[in-house]
From Swiss-Prot:
Its cofactor is Mg(2+). PANTHER family: PHOSPHO-N-ACETYLMURAMOYL-PENTAPEPTIDE-TRANSFERASE, PHOSPHO-N-ACETYLMURAMOYL-PENTAPEPTIDE-TRANSFERASE HOMOLOG. This is Phospho-N-acetylmuramoyl-pentapeptide-transferase. Keywords: Cell cycle, Cell division, Cell inner membrane, Cell membrane, Cell shape, Cell wall biogenesis/degradation, Magnesium, Membrane, Metal-binding, Peptidoglycan synthesis, Transferase, Transmembrane, Transmembrane helix. InterPro entries: Glycosyl_transferase_4, PNAcMuramoyl-5peptid_Trfase, PNAcMuramoyl-5peptid_Trfase_CS. The lineage of its organism: Bacteria, Bacillati, Cyanobacteriota, Cyanophyceae, Synechococcales. Pathway: Cell wall biogenesis; peptidoglycan biosynthesis. Its main location: membrane.
Amino acid sequence: MIHQKMIGKTRRLDFTTLFFLITLSLIVNSFIFNNLLIICIFLVFFSICILITNYGLKIIKQLNLLQNIRDTGPSFHFNKKNTPTMGGIFIILPLLLLLLIVNHYFYSMGIILLFFGSLSFFIIGFLDDYLSIKKKKNIGLRSTQKFILQSLISILFIVLAYQNGYINSLITVSNNWAIDTNIVIFPICFVTLVGLSNAVNLTDGLDGLASGCGSIVFYGLGTEIFIKGQQELIIYGLIAYAMSGLCVGFLKFNKYPAKIFMGDTGSLTIGATLGYISILTNSYFTLFIISGIFVIEALSVIIQVSFFKITKKIFKRGKRVFLMTPIHHHFELSGMKEEKIVENFWKINILLVILGIVLKINL
């Protein structure tokens, strides 16, 4: 009986286990790629996020920046009301500071684009969270307003990235294989930025889900960039590892039961930053695989809304595929515990990262 309990415990994937898994993997990567900055930058920004979140949490409580819960969500989420929010500040501000420092010592138009791109989505998320708190509703900016702002920023980034040689029609699948997409590359870039930022935002509905998956995906993206072996791209791999550290650091406070939420301030910017880095490093293919959880969450909403509208038009009464979307709510309403859903999604995300890296190496 004791042995069975010990086995059960060892199989559980929680914050501590996830942190050690990523840390050990990065130590291995440091030796494989002969670059100790890999593990160092992860641990430094992990520590920075823990320190500033621990201190900043008190300030957010004092400022009364508290979460509102939508009425249409699961009823058992109402106990999350008044949890401090806008914690994404403690993830994104260190990122922006890192980008400024990097650009100071290693001037690069790509870093400048990444800085202003991430800053722009940060501002959109900040405004959305602030207005939501001010209105005392779980709605800040209207969805059309957010989409227009996201679209304008994304189009500007794509144009500037293309003009500076960061975008071409070839999508790199592996070091030996590329696909020529012709002009389709531009809508691919647009969907990568706007789609992924909103996908992460949709995923951020359970304690620790978006921050945990974010840390895993950034780890995978950083590793993919190092596998490319292109010296000029290494800095983006290190930035991805820094973001992984920041997400894990925030996860310490965001895991169930959450002491703080990242809000749109964090989720929109995390998704956009993933998109920006993948565009600047031509990592679209791998990103699509390793971001599978985010993609599934977004697709579940699209499928639900589309199916409801189609069936309503045909049968005069809309029908649903899922109990509720995004899909993590479907599992909640099916009776699965929140912590178990998050743990399972993390496990799937880890498998997707392994798949993405294996395909990158072997294709």
